[in-house]
Amino acid sequence: MTRRMDRRQYAQVYGPTTGDRVRLGDTALVLEVDRDLTVYGDECVFGGGKVLRDGMGQAAGAPPEEVLDLVITNALVLDQGGVTKADVGIRGGRIAALGKAGNPDAMAGVTPGMTIGPGTECIAGEGLILTAGGVDSHIHFISPQQAYEAIASGVTTMLGGGTGPATGTNATTCTPGARHVALLLQATDALPVNIGLLGKGNAASPEGLAEQVRAGAVGLKLHEDWGTTPAAIDTCLRVADQLDVQVAIHTDTLNESGCAEHSIAAFAGRTIHTFHTEGAGGGHAPDIIRVCGEPNVLPSSTNPTRPFTVNTVDEHLDMLVVCHHLDPSLPEDLAFAESRIRRETIAAEDVLHDLGAISMMSSDSQAMGRVGEVVTRTWQTADKMRRQRGRLPEERGDNDNLRIRRYLAKYTINPAVAHGLSHEVGSVEPGKLADLVLWRPALFGAKPELVLKGGLIAWAQMGDANASIPTPQPVVARPMFGALGRAVGATSVAFVSRASLEGGAVQGYGLAKRLVAVHGCRGLGKKDMRLNDALPRMEVDPETYEVRADGVLLRCEPAARLPLAQRYFLF
């Protein structure tokens, strides 16, 4: 027996299917479902009188190794590879498969390995968008509370450096020295996110740098406040090449030890991740943005300049003074701060993101950036470009799928690839850690509905705990069981260097989190940045600061209004 349903009714019951379109929050961005892996008429739905009952959608007697621990039914999976309607199966804290879940004895087309049994929990994904947990690659570990803000926003992996509110950490993302690396790995062991630490990379001799990597650092950070000279750049990159870790860099704003071309020469074609590539966050003034045209450079932005608005320039001066230990009464300190803030390059940054020439987005947490706004600022930038530049010429169909996938990749798969984590996190693929974020479309980019860590709900929108049901106000983001006790260690990862694992250093720290070595950090290039691999020929006018890509002037107007803003955060 068959029954016909119109699209609206079907979407209300089972979620959108192929060809349906969904608006993201209050943005101008519209996604369209590319394909549906579920089976019409045999959809999995949980609840009273619904499908997932014993002998119906739930199998009896299936081998335990084939039964899912958790199924997310009928979710709209948004990933850098496309937009797919699917059941998502999780087993052992990892994504087992995307496809059709259920009881193969009673249902058609059940994907192998996606059997629902008595050991299976269910999350109803109908009408929800599912993405990978975000990867923030520019964390100043100033306060541990950042982790809670990050996971509440949909970020599940934090990479960076620091030792707390020390003056050095307030300015630089470095965890200097083997002892600090060990202590910070131990201190962050209780935080419900994946962690990776960057050691200090500023030295003209390699011994101190290698020591930090062998203690567990997943990379090294070169920062101008510690002296980013050509000699330090070369030494740091040599150590990174030997030990297979990434190098992140904040270049010399004052051009004291060299200009942009000198740093590019010191890179010598070797892989390097350039932080806040536009330059307001730091870097050769006024033309560090030129590195967007270098094939060995992996460029990222931090969120203080994202997107360019009528308030962006005014906001930056005070932030710079505080973060970089400047004295506003000293003319030279004020000149240093003002040299980094340029309307023209900030405007160009918007356009370069839209072209896919800046590949990643990050926070610069508590050091000019806001750790809980990486996701929001990314989608605000995408919306601004959609409104000001129109549809991308490469788009197909009446949707913004390419632009949406491009911006999603900036805070998921691309930082994971850049830092050697993509075998574990960064996308919704079988075998990867089940760090997943579920969104109501109306709240997409602003407030996640559920955040899963290693397949267990760690954060969620939750109502009054003394209420009779979960939904009474105030409904706010709250920690769940995945963020508590020994579940944190069972569902999260401490990323370390391979050298530290092989040398046995990190095994002695007594960490509850699983130790995972980064790998494949060297030999990467812009070509490896998914949907963000554009390599334009870059020019910056030293007098007017105008930026051109392939001869085209990059210009856009500052936004006076943004989506995903005050209407979402009244309380």
UniProtKB/Swiss-Prot annotation:
Per the entry, the cofactor note is: Binds 2 nickel ions per subunit.
| Localization (cell) | Cytoplasm
Under the heading Gene3D superfamilies, the entry gives: Metal-dependent hydrolases, Urease, subunit C, domain 1
Enumerate the InterPro entries for this protein: Amidohydro-rel, Metal-dep_hydrolase_composite, Metal_Hydrolase, Urease_alpha_N_dom, Urease_alpha_subunit, Urease_AS, Urease_asu, Urease_asu_c
Catalysed reactions, as listed in the record: urea + 2 H2O + H(+) = hydrogencarbonate + 2 NH4(+)
Which amino acid positions bind Ni(2+) 1, per UniProt?
Answer: 138, 140, 221, 364
Signal peptide as annotated in the record: none
Post-translational modification N6-carboxylysine, affected residues = 221
Regarding how it is modified after translation, the entry says:
Carboxylation allows a single lysine to coordinate two nickel ions.
Q: Name one Pfam family in it.
A: Urease_alpha
Instruction: Could you list this entry's UniProt keywords, alphabetically sorted.
Output: Cytoplasm, Hydrolase, Metal-binding, Nickel
Q: Which residues bind Ni(2+) 2?
A: 221, 250, 276
Keyword Phosphoprotein on this protein? Answer: no
> Where are the active-site residues found?
324 (proton donor)
- EC number(s) on file: 3.5.1.5
The primary site where this protein sits is: cytoplasm
Q: Where does substrate bind?
A: 223
Give the top-rank taxon of the lineage listed in the UniProt record for this protein.
Answer: Bacteria
Give a yes or no for keyword Metal-binding in this entry. yes
- Pathway(s) per entry: Nitrogen metabolism; urea degradation; CO(2) and NH(3) from urea (urease route): step 1/1
What molecular functions are annotated in GO for this chain?
nickel cation binding; urease activity
- Subunit structure as annotated in this protein's UniProt entry: Heterotrimer of UreA (gamma), UreB (beta) and UreC (alpha) subunits. Three heterotrimers associate to form the active enzyme.
The protein's matches in HAMAP family, at most eight in alphabetical order, are given as: Urease_alpha
User: What family is reported?
Assistant: Belongs to the metallo-dependent hydrolases superfamily. Urease alpha subunit family.
Could you identify this protein by its name? Urease subunit alpha
Q: Upper lineage ranks?
A: Bacteria, Pseudomonadati, Myxococcota, Myxococcia, Myxococcales
This protein's gene is called ureC
